[in-house]
Regions:
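PRPP-associated nucleotide enzymes
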Residues: 2-162
Length: 162
């Protein structure tokens, strides 16, 4: 994966449900008018915020989970053909998990209508084929492992969870 001097861990805020409730309240105006009947949260990051967005909108919530590092619809969750879904995630950096979520939803008959995220770290480099909204856009430089700047060379790469 990419390396950076900064890491934004949404799990630190998502452990406080009053904060999650407020973040979802702020996100609702961006997502409420798409006619969705279900919110989909990619594991792990989309679970807490996705469920709270669904609760506040009065919608069903399902999640996609990792199987062999790929998102999959499991636990007998099903979509009705053409069911309109919102994808809700905590952070996007390159957008790979959201693209996987969009693909999985379509493969199971759903129609994704929008994406909502707490933090967009993509620096404008992601684009999805549905509208996407974020509460915050943060721009931290990222680097390939073989192209680290001098100040990061020799530092230990850590991945506290993603």
């Amino acid at each position: 994966g990419l390396h950076s001097a900064h890491f934004f861990q949404c799990a630190q805020v998502c452990q406080y449900m009053d904060k999650v409730t407020r973040l979802a309240e702020i996100m609702l105006p961006m997502l409420k008018d798409y006619g969705a009947t279900t919110v989909v949260g990619p594991a792990m990051g989309g679970l807490v915020i996705g469920q709270e967005v669904a609760r506040q909108l009065g919608l069903r919530f399902v999640f996609l989970e990792k199987v062999n590092d790929q998102l999959a619809l499991r636990r007998n969750f099903k979509f009705v053909a053409g069911e309109k879904v919102l994808i809700v995630e905590d952070v996007i950096t390159r957008g790979g998990r959201v693209v996987e979520a969009l693909t999985q939803c379509r493969a199971h008959g759903a129609e994704p209508v929008a994406v909502g995220v707490i933090v967009d770290r993509s620096q404008g480099k992601t684009s999805f084929d549905v509208p996407h909204h974020s509460l915050a856009e943060l721009s931290f430089p990222t680097y390939q492992a073989d192209k680290l700047p001098p100040e990061l060379q020799g530092s230990e790469a850590i991945k506290p969870g993603s």
